[in-house]
Design a protein with these regions (language model features):
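Enriched for short, Lys/Arg-rich terminal
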Residues: 2, 11-25, 29, 42, ...
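Residue-level signal for threonine
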Residues: 6
Length: 87
C-alpha cells in the first residue's frame, strides 16, 4: 500500500528518527502491521469517534498513538505521536 503522511505526522516521524530509535522501530512495526492486517493486529487497534470517525488508532507506547485510515490502496497517517509532547 501507499503511505500518505499529514504534515504533523511526518514531523512526528522525523522527531522520533532523531530522538528515540526504540519508538521509531515500534512505529515502523505498526505501519508494517497496518499494511498487512488493516484494522487488526498489534497495538490494540480501535476506531475513533465523532470528528475523527473513519480513523483508527494504535498504541505506540503508554502515551503516544498512531492515527490512520485506509482508503483503497493508501494508508493515510494523520499522527504518530502525542499532541501533549512538547517539540
Amino acid at each position: 500500500m501507499i503511505k500518505s503522511w499529514s504534515d504533523d505526522a511526518w514531523d512526528d516521524f522525523c522527531y522520533w528518527q532523531k530522538q528515540d530509535k526504540k519508538t521509531l522501530k515500534r512505529i515502523l512495526a505498526l505501519i508494517k502491521d497496518i499494511d498487512r492486517n488493516g484494522y487488526t493486529g498489534i497495538g490494540k487497534p480501535e476506531p475513533l469517534r465523532e470528528d475523527l470517525s473513519g480513523y483508527w488508532s494504535r498504541r505506540i507506547d503508554g502515551v503516544n498513538r498512531i492515527v490512520y485510515k485506509i482508503a483503497a490502496d493508501t494508508i493515510y497517517i494523520a499522527q504518530c505521536g502525542s499532541h501533549y509532547r512538547d517539540k
